Amino acid sequence: MQSTCVYRECMRNHAAKLGSYAIDGCREYSQPSTGDLCVACGCHRSYHRRIDVISSPQINHTRFPFTSLRRVKQLARLKWKTAEERNEEEEDDTEETSTEEKMTVQRRRKSKFTAEQREAMKDYAAKLGWTLKDKRALREEIRVFCEGIGVTRYHFKTWVNNNKKFYH
């Protein structure tokens, strides 16, 4: 197994003193003949993103069936791991492959509110000033309101934060 490193784009923040963020656009470290300063941007090598590349000739990709995109990504990650990490992951993968084909990806369910719930939340949020911060004294009242219209406090808070720019 052979290990080398490659330096990619410059990550130096040139506007840090101003409290902002600005990079110079250098896409890859250009090795100078002497020293560690990049020929392209003049920054030290340590400012450039380092990628450790471990090449491993013993992995034969044709012996692995590609059952899903997830499996392909696992194999790509596996290519760059150490032998010990690779053995542990291969053991875990053999248990997952049979159930992996059966599982379907479930997306997070989006909350849907009725027109009455939206109108009630809009009126109550206007009464609160479109913020729930510093409303600890009203916490119980907010809980009762949410139970009354059939939404959780979390969903009400999220709805207020997402909609205050439209109604406030």
UniProtKB/Swiss-Prot annotation:
Region (Disordered): 82-112
Site (Required for DNA-binding): 160
Keywords: Coiled coil, DNA-binding, Homeobox, Metal-binding, Nucleus, Transcription, Transcription regulation, Zinc, Zinc-finger
The keyword Zinc appears for this protein: yes
Segments forming ZF-HD dimerization-type zinc fingers: 7-51
Tissue expression notes: Mostly expressed in flowers and stems.
GO cellular component, one term: nucleus
Acidic residues compositional bias, start-end: 86-98
Compartments reported by the entry: Nucleus
Signal peptide: none
Coiled coil: 76-103
DNA-binding region: 106-168
GO molecular function: DNA binding; protein homodimerization activity; transcription cis-regulatory region binding; zinc ion binding
The record's note on its domains: The homeodomain differs form the typical one by having namely 4 instead of 3 extra amino acids inserted in the loop between helix 1 and helix 2.
Subunit structure: Homo- and heterodimer with other ZFHD proteins. Interacts with ZHD11.
UniProt function note: Putative transcription factor.
The name this protein goes by in its record: Zinc-finger homeodomain protein 14
Species of the source: Arabidopsis thaliana
Highest classification ranks of the organism: Eukaryota, Viridiplantae, Streptophyta, Embryophyta, Tracheophyta
